[in-house]
Design a protein with these regions (language model features):
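Short, flexible, basic/aromatic active-site loop/helix in glycosyltransferases
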Residues: 130-167
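Short beta-strand-to-loop acidic/aromatic patch adjacent to the donor-nucleotide binding site
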Residues: 78-89
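A short, conserved alpha-helix in the catalytic core of glycosyltransferases
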Residues: 159-162, 168-187, 191-218
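Active-site-adjacent helix/loop segment of glycosyltransferases
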Residues: 203, 207-272
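Conserved donor NDP-sugar-binding/catalytic core segment of glycosyltransferases
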Residues: 89-125
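A conserved acidic beta->alpha catalytic loop
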Residues: 33-44
Length: 272
């Protein structure tokens, strides 16, 4: 069984309907809409298909919303669970391709496909485990050349994004995960209301299995950096980053260095 979930907060109906269309033309058996909005105006979408379950929830954050669906997926005996952003869409049944990849790579617990902008450009969402300089420097150090160079390293631009590779930190916009791994890790850490929760989850998954990037499958993402435009979102972003480093370590994080070095060596071997 394959389950999937999206968490919404006054999400564009157009985006959500487009995503639902992708889901219903795929091999996803059950799709959960966790609605954190201040009203349940999206409830009517449940009537589109019996494969859709709508859950109206208090807004406890992105990760906590997804945990509701993860618990349901575990109860249903799901084999794979997909975490999807509402502004994601794709062509064809890419889900079967991801299942085949996981079947062929039993040591992989999480896979992310290649994520593209609607115009076909690559989104650089494969990342190393971050240092404080990576996350704060890219935002607050006012030197464009420094930011670009640091980002290119942190976001692994040098990898080419054209080969299968193990990646320490993958984006939460589309995560294809073995449900038993989600059960072992306990899902998202509810302390992260918004931002950094995917980074934390991917890191915890990476401690017990491999987290992989699979560029043969393509997904489109209408990506917007909301915290760059909204002060309230910026506050959430900064708070989550602080919580992340309080949890894992700021400048002294031996596991971070070990994991990054391991993945860098693997990637260098693949490139050569």
């Amino acid at each position: 069984m394959i389950t999937a979930a999206v968490v919404t907060f006054h999400t564009s109906r157009k985006d959500l309907i487009r995503l639902i269309d992708c889901v219903l033309h795929s091999s996803i058996d059950k799709f959960f809409i966790i609605d954190n909005s201040t009203n349940d105006a999206l409830r009517e979408l449940e009537s589109v298909s019996e494969r859709i379950t709508y859950i109206y929830s208090d807004n406890l954050g992105f990760g906590s919303g997804h945990n509701i669906a993860i618990d349901r997926a575990i109860d249903l005996g799901s084999d794979y669970h997909i975490i999807i952003n509402p502004d994601i869409y794709w062509n064809g049944d890419i889900i079967e391709q991801l299942v085949q990849f996981m079947d062929q790579n039993k040591d992989c617990g999480l896979v992310m496909p290649k994520i593209l902008y609607p115009n076909g450009e690559v989104q650089y969402l494969c990342k190393l485990l971050p240092t404080p300089l990576d996350l704060f420097g890219r935002r607050f150090i006012p030197f464009k050349m420094f930011q670009e160079k640091r980002n290119a390293w942190y976001e692994m631009h040098w990898s080419g994004y054209d080969k299968v590779m193990e990646v320490p930190s993958l984006s939460g916009c589309f995560m294809f995960i073995r449900t038993d791994i989600l059960k072992k890790t306990g899902g998202f850490d509810k302390r992260f209301f918004m931002y950094a929760e995917d980074m934390d989850l991917c890191r915890r998954i990476g401690e017990i299995t491999r987290t992989m990037y699979y560029p043969s499958v393509l997904v489109f993402h209408e990506y917007e950096k909301g915290s760059y435009k909204n002060r309230k979102l910026l506050k959430y972003h900064i708070c989550s980053i602080i919580k992340y480093f309080n949890k894992w370590g700021w400048f002294i994080d031996k596991k971070r260095r070990k994991k990054n070095d391991y993945c860098l060596k693997l990637t260098e071997h693949i490139r050569n």
